[in-house]
């Protein structure tokens, strides 16, 4: 099998939620990325790599042979982060060879610079160094990366669609990292025997003749690529109805979700869905469809308990003050201290 040829995205069996989330992330990077959660062997990495066939063309700044910046248009690329990546590999660092041979400091671009206007994929993100994860998520939120190494500094754009995947059997993510991902997908093993058999049949056909297998889906993939590009163009025109806004915020409050990233993810994903459907307004139905993807795993039982404890403690403090007869506790305004007379006024004695 030619490792350079990705498995066709439309040949994936089942997993409609995963496929929907990945396409929405291509349409609207402001969603905040997608986290795929599931055991080994269920197609997480295969699905992400399959996106290369439907990625739209984008403009990005590159360097010509003389080192001058030029704008070039081409398809988005998938930039994969190695599991053993160091912080310097990600944000950029000093070129050690140049430093040793030429006795000068040269800052090299990191993975985040290469990911600009592309898709950054992090497999097994729960096993990655925490500092590396923080740097990536900060760049994704701010759209730029600042590097300082000794006297050298550099600020470069790093706007990208972010996809992460993990196996929860190997450990979890910190809540503050989990919160940064806009959509969360549980990629469960296929339950239907016929579906599992179809996975085998398609995998075998792809292994035996990848080019012939891909040809079966070529026309549909091309149409999907055009639809993704059209949705990205339409997205700025998509508005949100007042009823949809009200339902989104009411749902988040009813679930007692503390993070304001919840409404960003929910509403931006709903806008992406509408653009993909070639519509111009988010409705209540869009919110209902997207809510599980955007709101799951956002509730914090710890914070709910903490807030309840604070409320009880505040009531206890107020009760203690009331028993002591304090003016504030009894509803009386505190007496003002007599001040000096203002200029031009006579103090009353």
Which ranges hold each PLM region?
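Conserved ASCE/P-loop NTPase catalytic core
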Residues: 1-196
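Short amphipathic alpha-helical patches
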Residues: 32, 36, 45-50, 113-114, ...
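Residue-level signal for alpha-helical context at structural boundaries
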Residues: 40, 65-69, 108-109, 154, ...
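C-terminal engagement/docking regions of AAA+ P-loop ATPases
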Residues: 41-46, 250-261, 272-349
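Short, structured secondary-structure boundary patches
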Residues: 56-58, 75, 169-170, 209-210, ...
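Short leucine-rich amphipathic alpha-helices used at interfaces
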Residues: 104, 110, 154, 215, ...
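Noncatalytic linker/hinge segments flanking ATPase motor cores
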Residues: 118-125, 161-168, 202-210, 224-231, ...
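Basic, amphipathic alpha-helical bundle interface domains used for macromolecular binding and assembly
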Residues: 133, 191-301
């Amino acid at each position: 099998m030619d490792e350079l040829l990705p498995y066709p995205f439309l040949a994936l069996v089942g997993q409609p939620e995963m496929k929907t989330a990945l396409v929405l992330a291509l349409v609207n990077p402001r969603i905040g990325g997608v986290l795929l959660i599931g055991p080994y062997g269920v197609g997480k990495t295969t699905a992400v790599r399959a996106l290369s066939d439907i990625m739209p063309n984008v403009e990005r700044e590159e360097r010509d042979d003389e080192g001058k910046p030029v704008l070039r248009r081409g398809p988005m690329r998938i930039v994969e982060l190695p599991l053993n990546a160091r912080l310097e590999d990600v944000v950029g660092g000093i070129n050690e060879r140049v430093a040793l041979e030429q006795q000068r400091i040269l800052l090299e671009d990191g993975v985040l610079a290469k990911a600009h206007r592309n898709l950054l994929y992090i497999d097994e993100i729960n096993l990655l160094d925490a500092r590396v994860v923080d740097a990536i998520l900060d760049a994704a939120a701010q759209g730029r990366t600042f590097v300082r190494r000794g006297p050298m500094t550099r600020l470069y754009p790093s706007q990208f669609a972010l996809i992460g995947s993990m196996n929860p059997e190997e450990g979890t993510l910190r809540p503050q990292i989990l919160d940064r991902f806009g959509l969360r997908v549980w990629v469960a093993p296929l339950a239907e025997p016929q579906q599992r058999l179809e996975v085998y049949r398609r995998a075998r056909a792809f292994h035996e003749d990848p080019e012939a297998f891909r040809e079966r889906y070529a026309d549909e993939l091309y149409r999907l690529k055009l639809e993704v590009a059209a949705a990205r163009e339409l997205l700025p025109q998509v508005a949100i109805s007042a009823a949809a806004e009200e339902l989104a915020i009411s749902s988040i409050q009813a679930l007692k979700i503390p993070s304001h990233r919840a409404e960003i993810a929910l509403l931006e994903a709903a806008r992406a869905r509408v653009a993909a459907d070639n519509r111009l307004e988010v409705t209540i139905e869009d919110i209902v469809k997207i809510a599980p993807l955007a709101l799951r795993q956002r509730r914090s039982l710890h914070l709910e308990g903490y807030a309840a404890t604070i409320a009880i403690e505040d009531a206890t403090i107020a009760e203690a003050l009331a028993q002591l007869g304090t003016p504030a506790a009894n509803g009386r305004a505190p007496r003002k201290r007599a001040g000096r007379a203002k200029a031009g006024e006579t103090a009353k004695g």
